[in-house]
Amino acid sequence: KIKVMIKFKNLKFEPRDMGGVGAKHTFDNGITISVQASQFNYSTPKENLTSSDDFASFEVAMWDEDGEWVTKDFVPDAGDDVLGWQDRDEINALMLLIQDK
């Protein structure tokens, strides 16, 4: 069976109550990735825009089915459970790592 890999382009971004946009996706292995951009997130630009197309980078976090942070499992040198200013290629690489776990 061929496994279809989920990538950035497959994320469903929605407007957030506080402004900006965000997407969450839970993979078959139970890991969830959150990709957010707004004036409150580590994104470029740091503004409340209405489309993911308007952002060059995003804030990313990952957790398992128990709600435990797993960001550092995939990015060992991350200084935090949240990764700032991740571009589409970096997010695609993270998403592929998650799906290979």
Stretches found by the model and what they are:
Residues 4-101:
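Catalytic phosphate/metal-binding cores of nucleic-acid and nucleotide-processing enzymes, i.e., regions
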